[in-house]
Amino acid sequence: MSTSGCKHLQLVQEVRPIADGCQECLTIGDSWVHLRLCLISGDVGCCDASKNKHATKHFHSTKHPIIRSFELGEDWRWCYIDSTFV
């Protein structure tokens, strides 16, 4: 994965996931398709294939740009601002 051009990687922190599932979906009793982990705050949210799209909503409310997959066997990161894998 190319990291060239993404200046937002410097914001990444060593985080602990705040929850084992999408925090917002757990609160409202809903389900999700896949999980994403915010690499700035540790927030766990559901993906855009999930009806609630909580990971993207977290980005819009906090401006935390870098997430990674929170699924077993997946090892990728995404920058919302640059719209690219990093």
Language model features by range: what are they?
Residues T3-Q10, R16-Q23, I28, V44-V86:
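Cys/His-rich, Zn2+-coordinating zinc-finger modules
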Residues D30-L39:
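Canonical RING-type zinc finger of E3 ubiquitin-protein ligases
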